Each structure stands twice: as C-alpha cells, then as structure tokens.
C-alpha cells in the first residue's frame, strides 16, 4: 500500500456516495479520529485507520480505492467501542462519533449520518472512560496584560473555575496542580515544553480567546447582565480563557451544559502557594517513580466514595490560608472523633455512588439506566445521614446536614419507575418497571402472551389439518410462519399462503397469523418507543432538581473527607494543631506520616521550633541520617494543618504560612534542555525571588551540582539572603561544614544536626535532631554500606587523611564572622612608579591543591582565553588554525 497517497482526500464524484458522505464529515473534523458507524461496526478510513491500527492494535485492511490506490480501513465492534475510546482518551486523542440517524429501509443511497458527540480527553463523562479517583479537567490558558489567565472545567461535576497568575513559574505550578486531561492554548502563545509536550495539549485560534466574545457567551449561559456576581469581572485574562474553554465544551458535547451553574473565582491569594517542584518533592499524590504508592494521599485516602477521594486530592493540592475555614474543619473532625461518631457515618457513606458524575451525565442527557438506579439507592441513604448528624455540635457539620437534604419524592418516583436490576442501556428496553405505566404494560402483554398464543395456534392447526409435522415459529427476517415438512406440504389447506421454501419444508402464513404478527411486532416497537419516552421523562423530572442534587452531592463528598480525616487521625495518632495569625512553627515529637507507615522499626520523632527569634536552622549530618525526612515531615505537617487536618505529632502550634518551597533532590530536564545544576538553580531562583517572611523554605544541598567553591559560595549567599532579606522560615541542609559558622554572623540562624555513631567498624544512624553542628559526615561509612569495594574505601580514606592534613582558610565550625571569606581575590595592579613585586599579590588558593600539575601550556592559555559562545563560524575556524600553529 502506498503510504504517500493515503492522506484523507477531498470528496469527489469518483468516490462512492458512502465515501463522499464520510469525507464531508471528516473535512469538518480534521483534528479528531472519526468513528463512522456502519452496521455493527465503527469504521475508520485513510490516516485515521492507520493511526487507529497503531494505537489500538486493530487490523489495518483496505476498502475500495481513492485516486487509484486502496483506501486504508480499520474497524472496532460497536458493542466494544467504549473500551477503544477509553484507550484513545488516555492517549490524549479526540474522537468524533458518527451515528446512523436515518432508516436504512426507507433511505435511497447512503443512510443519513451525523456527528452525535465528540469525545475528547477533557470533556468525557462516560463512566467507562474515566478514572473515578481523579478529576478529569479541561483547562484553558492565555496571556493578557502580562498575566496568565487559567480556567478549568470538570465536565463530570460541572465545577467551573477561573483565576490568574503573574508569571510562568506560577503557571507551571498551577498546571502541575490541576493535571489537566486536555489543555487549550492560543496558537501564538509561547509556553514551556513542560506544558506544550503534555498529552492532550491543543492549540486553538487566537480569536477564540477574545474577552468580549467570552463575556457575551458566559453571561448568556448564566443569564446575568455581567460577571460581577461571580467576583471575577476584572480578571480579563481569566475570563478570556474561560470563554474559549466553555465554547469548546459546548461544541464537543452538542448540548447546553445545564449542570455548569456558576463560575467560581479560584483565588490563589486564599491558598498556600505550592510550586511544581514542591508538589513533586513532597510526593503529595504521586511519588518520584510516578505512582501513588507511599504518598501522602495513599496514607490518608480511606474515603468511602469516589467523589470524596477526588475532593481529598484537591484539598492536599490546595492548602488554605483562611483560618476560619480551617478551624471549622478542625472542629468538625473533633466532633466526629467524640464517641467515634465518624464510624456509623462512614458505614452509611459506603452505600453512596459517584453522585457528582451521575448528575453530570444526567445534565448531558447521557445518563444510563443503572445511573438512575444508583442515584435512587444513594439519595435513599440521605435520611440515615441526617439522623447520624443530628445532635453533633459542629457548625460545618450542621451546614452539611442542611445541604444533604432528603428527596422522598424522587426516591418514590425512581423506586416505582425502574426495574430492580435494569440493563446497561435503554436500547433493548426492560428498564421501566411493571405497573408504572398502564399503556406500556398493555403493549408488553401482547408480546409476552405471544408464546402462549402460538402454542394454542399450533395445537389448533394440527387438529384442524391432521398434519403431524406442522409447527408455528418466528424469525427476525420472515416474521411468524407455519412450517410443514415436504412430505405433508401438498396437504396444506388452501387458505395457507406460501411464504418460504426450505430444503426439507415449506413455510406458510395465514390471514389470522398475519393479523397477529402485525399486532405483536407493532406492540414490541411501540413498547420500546413508549419505554424510551418514559425514560426521557424521568431524566427531565430529575433535571428539575439538578441544582439541589448537586449541592447534596458536594456535601456528601465533604462529609466523606471529614469522616476519613477523623478516622485517619484516630488510627494514626494525630493531634489537633493550634492555628494562629502570628508567625512561628512549633512541633513536638513530629513524625513523617508516610515514612512512619512503611518502616518496620518505630519511627524516631523530632521537635522543631521556628519563631521570630529563630527563623532558620542549618542542618548537618551524615547521608541517610534523616535530614531530608526531617525537612519533608515539617512541610507535610504544616500542609496537613492548613487543610484543616490533624497532624502526626504530640503537639503543634502553627502561624499560617503563605507558601511552601522545596529545593530537594536532583534531576535534569531533558525536554527543557536543562542540566541538573540548572534545574537546581532555577528552583533556587524561584525561592529567592518569591519567598516572604511567612513562607516555609526547605533547601537541601544547594550548590552540590558544581565545583566545591562555586557551590559553597552559592550556598553561603543563599543563607545570607534568606536570613537578612527574606526572613523566611527556613530549613537549610548542607554538607558544607563551613556554613555552620554562619549563626555567629547572622541573627535568627541556628545549627542543628542529625547524629550517628560508629560501632564495631559500622555506622548507626540515630535519626535524632540535636543542637549544634555535626562532628563529621560519615561519607566513607555510608559508601561502605552502599557496597563500594573495600579497596576503593581504603584508597578514599587515604585521600581523606591527606586532604584533611592540608592547610585551608578554615576548618569546620571556625567560620569567620562577621566579614565573609574572600574566596578569590583579584591580583592587584602595580602602582605607578612602583615595582611589580611590591604590589599586592594574590594569596594562595584556600581550596586544597588536589592534583598538583605543571604550569599551563601555551595551548591551555589560548583555550582559556576563548569563549566559544561568542565566536562566529569564521572566527572559530581561525582559532583552530591558531591553536594548530601554537602546538
């Protein structure tokens, strides 16, 4: 097959009528794979077929010709289409679903077909296509007036948000938080690779992000004069993004989005800022290997409903700075812990289905019979929830009790209307219960009694004709018939009308049987039509109370999270933190909530104090001693407190922080073309440019990605900037022991260390925070534990003793104060009329001369004078010739 000629062509008279129809539809949807319904299959053609064959592992065949070449074709069975759609959606591919809407029996030429829906990664609502544990978000971004506008829509729940951020780093952080399934951006907007290379990234025409168009669209949908009621009328960039997003959602869903009831201003100023590096380093819901194992979410998530699990994930990624809301959540957890009142509530909540997404499908008119059945069973549990909440003294729980109100009329309606175990789809009927509709019951009775009638007719005709081989039957092609064997067919009565000849029998029809056939077949089709009409009526009736049902579903999700946090706090021995508006972090016997769960040995808890007099701790100690764990547990305790949860400690008092920053670990950014050190410096720059005195900063091993003195200088300067200018609460872990002298020079800075001890030629990590700097790093002992060959360890020990014997500017813990070390002084120029030898000379380098060598050669001197970044190609070639001449 010639792959160069299989691109989708333009329809012309050389194509069959069916293919012309397909090509017209495909021309309208060039960016989607088109699933074209033909009988029991969805067929794909041309490039779509080739792409599907590769992505879905289906067979690539051919059908007919275009421009003299075979047309590539692939197909998937209609009944299994959802599985294939799910796979494409996960790969970030959009699909246009084309259905037959005409009647083949009455249509001349190709059956009429039209696009019934467009399935995109960010707009799917079908249960089979979604991960119930994660939000499935459509997000749009744009840039206006030097601010990034961001809007998100959860099609399943109808949650629609808008907000703005000031810079690219904040944009990356928000995309990391939202984890969109599909991301829309203007064609001309330049974004970092970390965003543009995401699966589901779509470029849209710039005109789709026009502010005036967006405002008209949104005010028309919400039925308002302007957007001031949502508090976002001044967010030009945000509204522009929201307009593009909403238009795209309407276009793909082919319906009004009635479940999108409001636009929420998701104001970053009310939340703790977490950048992308912090979310990654703290492993909130994804570990560094890319899975959920051993994450904070995995430890906390014992939610009983899918929507509760999704809300808990959102809380972890959006800690709050509103002390009123946090105190309300704490009080609710405290009330639920009283007499273990969370237990009966959790037992009841287990019976509640994913109401958010069921209601989303209800609003989109795509709800299936089992959705309605689960909705009925779920809202039937609301009275029990009301009973459990009655009498619990908590303002937040009382508010939720009002939201999760009873719906007795809907429970009664759905209980009467639906079969006990309805089928998956309405197509074949069997959904509406007997006794709900008299007309439907009558039509069903005709079909149900057909079997009895045929038995009686067969007995009657055998007795009347005396033909022993006579029998009455039915098939889909020829309908009802009387069948008589060949040997007796000639004795058939004259009123028998021949219908079909078989090899060994003849089939007949009689006027009486034809009358019954018309009535029975008509009754079946009329029953299906009646049932479909009743089902649609149910959908409309439920949509009349959609807003109240959405509020109740939201209340159930929040109640689920609160009862889960109560259960976790009880089982994991968490304490209630004291929150206040001032500055300071006090943690007594703090623990890492995740590490504690995976250790076989008891976790060693540690204290922490940061306040107005002690704002920074310089942490030293051996690798594997627990420095990173101590730092991370501090951040996680603060984060848990600021979602309103209890924390893993014996006591905690916290002044709310506005941001949490982490510079921990090492990794490169191949897609962005950044080295490990460049990533480290970029993250450090973000901290130094954006941290405030109310921020919590964790910095681990700053400067290790470059030479010793470059790294030491950078780490030193970072400590000074954080202490003197930003005054942020900081945990600064380092192996540069020279930095432990800084507390003598900088106010509010103290040394602490995690200790270890040597025992029988091995090392024992104590994991306990102690005041003061560490005495040694134990690097060789850790290397030995890691399995480094003994001869290498021995050689390293010799090198270490030689290096330690060499004089340096400072030994550990003798950092000069207050004047900083001149790590490298320039050579002074000779004064006029004074011998050069009398000028100030450059002192010996304080860094040990590890590998003494001869003076540099002329070639080396020449090479050092060349900056390759500033050379033109011609200059580079000339430099090469010069070097050749020198050598």
Curated annotation (Swiss-Prot):
Keywords for the protein's UniProt record, in alphabetical order: ATP-binding, DNA damage, DNA repair, DNA-binding, Nucleotide-binding
Domain of life, source organism: Bacteria
InterPro entries: DNA_mismatch_repair_MutS, DNA_mismatch_repair_MutS-lik_N, DNA_mismatch_repair_MutS/MSH, DNA_mismatch_repair_MutS_C, DNA_mismatch_repair_MutS_clamp, DNA_mismatch_repair_MutS_core, DNA_mismatch_repair_MutS_N, DNA_mismatch_repair_MutS_sf
Biased composition (Low complexity): 834-848
GO cellular component: cytosol
One Gene Ontology MF term: mismatched DNA binding
Region of interest (Disordered), residue spans: 828-853
GO biological process: mismatch repair
Binding site for ATP: 621-628
PROSITE patterns given in the database record: DNA_MISMATCH_REPAIR_2
Family: Belongs to the DNA mismatch repair MutS family.
Function of the protein: This protein is involved in the repair of mismatches in DNA. It is possible that it carries out the mismatch recognition step. This protein has a weak ATPase activity.
Stated name of the protein: DNA mismatch repair protein MutS
Organism name: Saccharophagus degradans (strain 2-40 / ATCC 43961 / DSM 17024)
């Amino acid at each position: 097959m010639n792959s160069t000629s299989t691109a989708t062509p333009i329809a012309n008279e050389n194509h069959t009528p069916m293919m012309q129809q397909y090509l017209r539809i495909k021309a309208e949807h060039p960016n989607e794979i088109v699933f074209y319904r033909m009988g029991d299959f969805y067929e794909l053609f041309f490039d779509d077929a080739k792409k599907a064959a590769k992505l879905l592992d289906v067979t690539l065949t051919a059908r007919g010709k275009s421009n003299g070449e075979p047309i590539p074709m692939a197909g998937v069975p209609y009944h299994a289409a959802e599985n294939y759609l799910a796979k494409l959606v996960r790969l970030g591919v959009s699909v246009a679903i084309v259905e037959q809407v005409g009647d083949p029996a009455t249509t001349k030429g190709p059956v009429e077909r039209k696009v019934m829906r467009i399935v995109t990664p960010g707009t799917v609502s079908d249960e089979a296509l979604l991960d119930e544990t994660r939000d499935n978000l459509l997000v749009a971004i744009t840039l206006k007036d030097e601010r990034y506008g961001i809007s998100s829509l959860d099609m399943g729940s109808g949650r629609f948000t808008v907000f703005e951020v000031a810079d690219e780093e904040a944009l990356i952080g928000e995309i990391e938080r939202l984890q969109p399934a599909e991301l829309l951006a203007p064609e001309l907007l330049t974004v970092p690779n970390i965003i543009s290379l995401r699966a589901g990234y779509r470029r849209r025409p710039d005109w789709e992000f026009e502010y005036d168009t967006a405002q008209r669209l949104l005010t028309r949908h919400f039925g308002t004069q302007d957007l001031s009621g949502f508090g976002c009328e001044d967010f030009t960039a945000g509204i522009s993004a929201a307009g593009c997003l909403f238009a795209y959602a309407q276009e793909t869903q082919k319906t009004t989005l009635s479940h999108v009831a409001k636009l929420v201003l998701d104001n970053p100023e009310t939340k703790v800022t977490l950048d992308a590096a912090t979310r990654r380093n703290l492993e909130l819901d994804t570990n560094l290997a890319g899975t959920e194992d051993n994450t904070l979410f995995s430890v906390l998530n014992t939610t009983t409903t899918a929507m509760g699990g999704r809300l808990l994930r959102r809380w972890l990624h959006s800690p709050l700075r509103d002390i009123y809301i946090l105190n309300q959540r704490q009080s609710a957890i405290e009330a639920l812990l009283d007499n273990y009142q969370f237990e009966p509530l959790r037992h009841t909540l287990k019976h509640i289905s994913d109401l958010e997404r069921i209601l989303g499908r209800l609003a989109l008119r795509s709800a299936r019979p089992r959705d309605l059945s689960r909705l009925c069973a779920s809202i039937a549990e609301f009275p029990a929830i009301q009973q459990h909440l009655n009498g619990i003294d908590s303002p937040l729980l009382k508010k939720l009790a009002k939201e999760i109100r009873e719906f007795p009329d809907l429970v009664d309606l759905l209980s009467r209307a639906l079969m006990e175990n309805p089928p998956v789809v309405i197509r074949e009927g069997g959904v509406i219960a007997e006794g709900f509709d008299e007309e439907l019951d009558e039509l069903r009775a005709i079909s149900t009694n057909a079997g009895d009638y045929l038995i009686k007719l067969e007995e009657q005709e055998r007795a009347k004709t005396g033909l022993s081989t006579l029998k009455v039957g039915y098939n889909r092609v020829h309908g009802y018939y009387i069948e008589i064997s060949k040997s007796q067919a000639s004795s058939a009565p004259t009123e028998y009308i021949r219908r079909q000849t078989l090899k060994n029998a003849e089939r007949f029809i009689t006027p009486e049987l034809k009358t019954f056939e018309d009535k029975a077949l008509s009754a079946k089709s009329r029953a299906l039509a009646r049932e479909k009409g009743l089902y649609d009526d149910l959908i409309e009736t439920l949509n009349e109370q959609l807003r109240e049902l959405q509020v109740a579903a939201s209340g159930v999700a929040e109640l689920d999270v609160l009862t889960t946090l109560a259960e976790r706090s009880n089982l994991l021995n968490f304490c209630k933190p004291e929150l206040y508006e001032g500055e300071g972090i006090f943690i007594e016997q703090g623990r890492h909530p995740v590490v504690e769960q995976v250790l076989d040995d008891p976790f060693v808890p540690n204290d922490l104090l940061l306040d107005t007099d002690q704002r920074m701790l310089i942490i030293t100690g051996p690798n594997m001693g627990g420095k990173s764990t101590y730092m991370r547990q501090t951040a996680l305790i603060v984060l848990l407190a600021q979602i309103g949860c209890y924390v893993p400690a014996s006591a905690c008092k916290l002044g709310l922080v506005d941001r949490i920053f982490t510079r921990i670990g090492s990794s490169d950014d191949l897609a962005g073309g950044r080295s490990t050190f460049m990533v480290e410096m970029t993250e450090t720059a973000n901290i130094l440019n954006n941290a405030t005195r109310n921020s919590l900063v964790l910095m681990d091993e700053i400067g290790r990605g470059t030479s010793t003195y470059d790294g030491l200088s950078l780490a030193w300067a970072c400590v000074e900037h954080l202490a003197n200018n930003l005054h942020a609460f900081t945990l600064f872990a380092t192996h540069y022991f020279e930095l432990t002298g800084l507390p003598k020079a900088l106010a509010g800075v103290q040394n602490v260390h995690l200790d270890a001890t040597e025992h029988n030629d091995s090392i024992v990590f104590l994991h306990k925070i102690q005041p003061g700097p560490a005495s040694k790093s134990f690097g060789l002992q850790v290397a030995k534990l890691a399995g480094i060959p003994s001869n290498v360890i021995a050689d390293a020990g010799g090198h270490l003793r030689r290096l330690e014997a060499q004089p340096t500017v400072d030994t550990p813990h003798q950092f000069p104060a207050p004047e900083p070390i001149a790590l490298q002084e320039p050579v002074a120029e000779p004064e006029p009329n004074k011998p050069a030898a009398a000028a100030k000379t450059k002192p010996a380098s304080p860094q040990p001369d590890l590998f003494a060598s001869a003076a540099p050669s002329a070639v080396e001197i020449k090479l050092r004078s060349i900056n390759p970044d500033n050379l033109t190609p011609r200059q580079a070639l000339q430099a090469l010739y010069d070097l050749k001449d020198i050598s």
